[in-house]
Amino acid sequence: YYNIECNCIGTVLVGVGPQRNNREHAPADVTAQIQRWSSLGRTPFEERVEEVTWEVALVVPYTVFFKHQITSLDGKEIKANFYKCGDELQTPHFLSWNPIEIEQPCFI
């Protein structure tokens, strides 16, 4: 299981492991391979309390899946979901692209 996290300015974290706990984090030379763009730029900032819209785009090469030697997705079935987590914000919120089919999803 690979977990790729990204904030609104394109800072990424990649982890791999069978469960949520004790995942191995990708080294910096691996995460540096992810191309990223953010409409908010790349400079960190404090929480913005006014209404803000933003976009982020990532290009994730096969090499980011650093525990496997993936060179093609031909003939493979993969699954993914996208989440937006604002658990540490003034107004906590959570969104997902696809439905989460468990009663109480955990976003931490």
Name each model-derived stretch.
Residues Y1-I108:
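Structural preference for beta-rich elements and adjacent junctions enriched in aromatics
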